[in-house]
């Protein structure tokens, strides 16, 4: 895929808008009741689509537009809009989850480069997305370690910020990777 300046600008804004939309969209799975055909209930997974939108843009457009979209998103968050789970402004650097925010930049880079280094395949997109998720959690774990007062605090933070949301994120990244693969097929 040829990346021109206009391509980068367009995908940067698409990524930024997807990040904004993802913030307000919880990840829920429908549960169908065969006996009651009128009601569909939804299982709340406890996370939003922020990680998925970041990795989707990385796998579809590459590392550069995804990083620029994350930078725009961070700038808006710093200047007062509550775009992150932990709030906004410069105070968010004092939150234990700050490492995950920084990790989103590394994830954009890793997933975006990996998605384009080999021929397009679903397996390559899946590996790219999951490696990006790993980068987010690695940066997050380091940030938690730096923020923790003790080993016990770090373990409890790690459970709260990484282990509890991880199963939902694994499912969400799988579904997002399929969507990214289909988009890449259309764009190629």
UniProtKB/Swiss-Prot annotation:
InterPro entries: BioY. GO terms for molecular function: biotin transmembrane transporter activity. Disulfide bonds: none annotated. The keyword 4Fe-4S does not apply. Keywords: Cyanelle, Plastid. GO terms for cellular component: cyanelle; plasma membrane. Pfam families: BioY. It is found in: Plastid, Cyanelle. This is Uncharacterized 21.2 kDa protein in psbX-ycf33 intergenic region.
